[in-house]
Design a protein with these regions (language model features):
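N-terminal hydrophobic or amphipathic segments with adjacent small-residue motifs
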Residues: 29-31, 62, 133, 219, ...
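Signal peptide-directed extracytoplasmic domains
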Residues: 42-212
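Generic detector of contiguous secondary-structure segments
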Residues: 22-25, 191
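Short hydrophobic beta-strand segments
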Residues: 37, 105-109, 324-328
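Hydrophobic membrane-insertion alpha-helices, especially the h-region
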Residues: 24-39
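Bacterial extracytoplasmic/cell-wall-associated proteins, especially those involved in peptidoglycan
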Residues: 150-158, 169-358
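Terminal targeting segments of Actinobacterial cell-envelope proteins
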Residues: 1-21
Length: 358
């Protein structure tokens, strides 16, 4: 019997071919590693051939990174402004810095004659951002928000009010019924130096929409048999009457009084009607003829009395369980609020408040 000595498929021949291929790949990887090492070494010595300045630069120049700009486009912008010697100087420096992908659109305060490394480092520093900040605390009425927005952006109050008059086209929800009070969401905003009044108003309304979506405002309001506007109004009452830790209990008081057909009798609503912020109101003030005066008018006021935050919106949709009908800030200086179910207990709490108020 004879045997065929020709190697079969998968025998030693192909195995030797795979070994050769692996050897080639290993060699290529080694060459790439050597190349990268040489580049990094040359770059550290400043002899890569890329035009680059040395040092931190001097003077001041503002550059703008547009939305969607690539690192190459940012580099070109910097080079055109004289910040870096070439776009490649910035791009190569950015490639060596993983955080460079976080460079966001906006205006940056840079210096002329910077090295690529220095330019990347400065752009990653939040302090280099040229922005106009507007801080709107929770519970502010829209007049204060307009004043703060004017001061922070340099825009006139008149131009901001003109934009507010067109809020329906800038994102004001239809259920707001044209009333901007309560819908300029409290937050800290950052705007570009050339921001317009429309953009300021739109940003605040958009932020409200985000908060409303987060709490599922419209659907959950409907579950309670309320409109979204009524829930925002309740949230503004919580914001104006109590501290965050008491929001849910005050919300329960509101619901209980509405169910009993009792007037809410909230000082915050009278203050809103009068444009004041008094801790104690006179009889004349309490007799103010206004649909916002919840001493005279039963039910909720026509709309929000300030801009509530998300915690107040949540509490308005999630009142605590309880039978309270009254609450009194018995010790405002220390943030103490107490609750009562009977009128007699309420009177006792009121006496405690008067004693603490002096």
């Amino acid at each position: 019997m004879t045997y065929d000595e020709t190697p079969v498929s998968g025998g030693p021949g192909p195995r030797r071919s795979w070994s050769g291929l692996i050897a080639v790949l290993v060699s290529l990887a080694a060459l790439v590693a050597i190349g990268v090492g040489v580049f990094v070494g040359l770059r550290s010595l400043g002899i890569t051939g890329t035009q680059d300045f040395e040092g931190e630069g001097s003077g001041s120049v503002t550059v703008v990174v547009e939305p969607g700009d690539t690192l190459s486009q940012i580099g070109a912008t910097l080079a055109d402004a004289g910040v870096v010697a070439s776009a490649d100087a910035f791009v190569s420096a950015a490639a060596a810095e993983p955080r460079s992908s976080s460079i966001a659109p906006g205006s940056y305060a840079m210096r002329e004659g910077m090295s690529g490394d220095a330019a990347v480092t400065l752009m990653l520093d939040p302090e280099s951002r040229v922005v106009k900040k507007v801080a709107v605390p929770e519970g502010w009425r829209f007049e204060r928000t307009v004043a703060a927005a004017s001061k922070g952006t340099g825009l006139s109050e008149e131009s901001l009010r003109e934009s507010l008059s067109r809020a329906g086209s800038l994102g004001l929800p239809a259920y707001a019924e044209g009333n901007v009070e309560g819908f300029l969401f409290p937050a800290t905003y950052e705007f570009q130096p050339d921001v317009t009044s429309d953009e300021v108003v739109e940003a605040m309304l958009t932020r409200f929409d985000q908060a409303a979506a987060d709490v599922d405002l419209e659907a959950r309001a409907a579950e309670r048999g309320l409109t979204a506007l009524e829930v925002v109004t309740i949230a503004s009452l919580l914001q104006g009457e109590s501290a965050p830790e008491d929001y849910d209990k005050v919300a329960r008081v509101i619901y209980n009084r509405l169910e009993e057909g009792m007037p809410l009798q909230f000082d915050s609503t009278v203050n809103y009607a009068l444009g004041t912020s008094d801790l104690q109101l006179s009889k004349d003030q309490l007799a103010t003829d206004s649909p916002y005066n919840t001493y005279r008018v039963r039910g909720l006021p026509p709309g929000p009395i300030n801009s509530p935050g998300e915690a107040a919106l949540q509490a308005a949709l999630n009142p605590a369980k309880g039978t309270w009908l009254y609450f009194v800030a018995t010790d405002p200086a220390n943030g103490v609020t107490e609750f009562a179910t009977s009128y007699e207990d309420f009177l006792q709490l009121k006496r405690e408040f008067q004693a603490n108020a002096g």
